[in-house]
């Protein structure tokens, strides 16, 4: 019986049958695909997730499930106790699917720096873009922990593909939480179906962390607004069909003068340039320019002057999934390193027998597991109609998980020695991809400012 992804309205899309070999390989990327297959029976042989959902109840935040045995899929990953049966089934299904349909393209996507259309279409086949969209608007309405699992499992094999799923959700969050019902009904079903992609245009060349310093303008003209300005570091620039753009309707009011708009690409948005990035090379990042673009007033999100509040509200709810992406990158590096250590021989045996290297692997796993727990806690808070605590825990989850991903991938390169420094093996890609998780959606230095402020506020 073929499984379907939970919360996707009974989709009958099947996961590809297990087709990967399990022997050793001289190719680093081949080694990754062969040695990281689950040791448990193929999820393709299990009952459908629709049946599992009926038996176990609907997908729910992780905290609602009592503890079960640890390390279900092996000794490296130990947070299964926090997941419901449905969430574990979803994770296992998506893990195999990602290894079979996403991982084979990951190195080429990184090398060519081209958008991973093949991987994106594979995600659409499983209706993954629908995961974070409410059911009332054609989505799956999945809880945030399940969305974090998606980000993690995709990032475990290809962080660029993971970001393609996260960015449209980020772009649609202002519409979901602040937009009119007309905007929701027009755009959300198309994003959920993978027919549209969305971008989030907040940063500018001289207004990254200091959002209130933005210079983009929006001037009312009858039933329209005229938008002018440039936005930098825009994920999916040129690929997305719609862009959430923040601009000042009152240039002297600082942050209180910012307003949010939903702008279609064909209305006059242009991409001035794409960046040649260190990592996440399959996810285009560019400068988006608006030169007197006319936007209907009906496409304003929220009221005039609410833009700063909308931006911060959105990032609070998105940062935990950036933490999940970072955890996925770290987990991919751990899994690859562990497999490599068992196959690589030196001093008369596998290097996995060397205590010093075992200690490194243990530290990597401990840090990653702690990050995962913090990410899941922050994600559960999103589902709890959160108070100020989400700002604190969202910042903590993002900062801690991204620092963890960076330290773990550095150690993974070290464990592979000279091989880790070459592009024949994936750990250097993991390292390059991990770096940006410390930067985007608020640098970790800014996150620490937020964390300290929130702690002192309640002291």
Predicted features along the sequence, with ranges:
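A short, Trp-centered hydrophobic/proline-enriched beta-strand micro-motif
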Residues: 194-202
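Conserved hydrophobic/aromatic beta-strand scaffold that supports enzyme active sites
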Residues: 199, 213-217, 224, 242-246, ...
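Short Gly/Pro-enriched turn/cap motifs at secondary-structure boundaries
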Residues: 191, 206-209, 233-236, 250-252, ...
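Short glycine/proline-enriched turns and hinge-like loops at secondary-structure junctions
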Residues: 142-143, 210-212, 236-240, 254-257, ...
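A short core secondary-structure module
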Residues: 223-224, 228-271
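Alpha-helical interface subdomain recognition
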Residues: 23-28, 40-43, 65, 69-161, ...
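Intrinsically disordered, low-complexity segments enriched in small polar residues
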Residues: 4-14, 21-30, 34, 39-42, ...
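Flexible, small-/acidic-enriched active-site or ligand-binding loops
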Residues: 213, 268-296
């Amino acid at each position: 019986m073929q499984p379907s992804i939970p919360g996707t309205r009974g989709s009958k899309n099947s996961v590809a049958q297990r087709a990967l070999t399990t022997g050793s390989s001289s190719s680093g990327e081949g080694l990754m695909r062969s040695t990281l297959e689950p040791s448990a029976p193929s999820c393709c042989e299990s009952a459908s997730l629709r049946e599992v959902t009926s038996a176990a109840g609907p997908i729910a935040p992780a905290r609602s499930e009592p503890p079960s045995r640890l390390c279900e899929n092996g000794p490296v990953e130990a947070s299964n106790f926090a997941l419901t049966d449905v969430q574990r089934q979803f994770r296992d299904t998506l893990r195999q699917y990602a290894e079979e349909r996403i991982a084979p393209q990951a190195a080429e996507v990184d090398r060519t720096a081209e958008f991973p259309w093949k991987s994106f279409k594979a995600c659409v086949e499983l209706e993954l873009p629908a995961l974070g969209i409410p059911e009332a608007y054609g989505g799956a309405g999945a809880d945030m922990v399940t969305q974090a699992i998606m980000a993690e499992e995709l990032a475990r094999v290809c962080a660029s593909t993971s970001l393609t799923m996260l960015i449209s959700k980020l772009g649609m969050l202002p519409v979901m939480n602040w937009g009119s019902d007309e905007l929701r009904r027009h755009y959300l079903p198309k994003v959920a179906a993978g027919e549209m992609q969305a971008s989030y245009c907040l940063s500018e060349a001289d207004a990254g962390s200091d959002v209130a310093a933005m210079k983009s303008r929006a001037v009312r003209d009858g039933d329209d607004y005229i938008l002018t300005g440039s936005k930098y570091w825009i994920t999916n620039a040129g690929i997305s069909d719609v862009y959430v753009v923040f601009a000042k309707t009152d240039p002297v009011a600082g942050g209180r003068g910012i307003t949010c708009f939903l702008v279609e690409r064909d209305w006059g948005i242009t991409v001035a340039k794409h960046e040649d990035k260190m990592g996440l090379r399959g996810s285009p990042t560019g400068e988006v320019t608006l030169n007197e673009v006319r936007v209907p007033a009906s496409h304003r999100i929220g009221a005039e002057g609410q833009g700063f509040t909308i931006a911060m509200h959105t990032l609070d709810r998105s940062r935990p999934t950036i933490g999940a992406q970072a955890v996925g990158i770290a987990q991919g590096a751990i899994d690859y390193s562990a497999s490599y250590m068992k196959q690589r021989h030196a001093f008369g045996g596998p290097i996995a027998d060397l205590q010093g290297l075992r200690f490194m692997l243990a530290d990597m796993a401990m840090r990653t597991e702690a990050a995962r727990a913090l990410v899941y806690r922050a994600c559960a808070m999103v589902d709890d109609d959160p108070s100020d605590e989400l700002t604190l825990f969202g910042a903590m989850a993002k900062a801690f998980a991204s620092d963890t991903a960076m330290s773990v991938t550095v150690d993974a390169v070290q464990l592979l020695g000279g091989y880790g420094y070459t592009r024949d093996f994936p750990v250097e890609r993991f390292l390059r991809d991990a770096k940006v998780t410390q930067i985007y959606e608020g640098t970790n230095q800014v996150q620490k400012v937020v964390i300290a402020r929130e702690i002192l506020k309640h002291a």
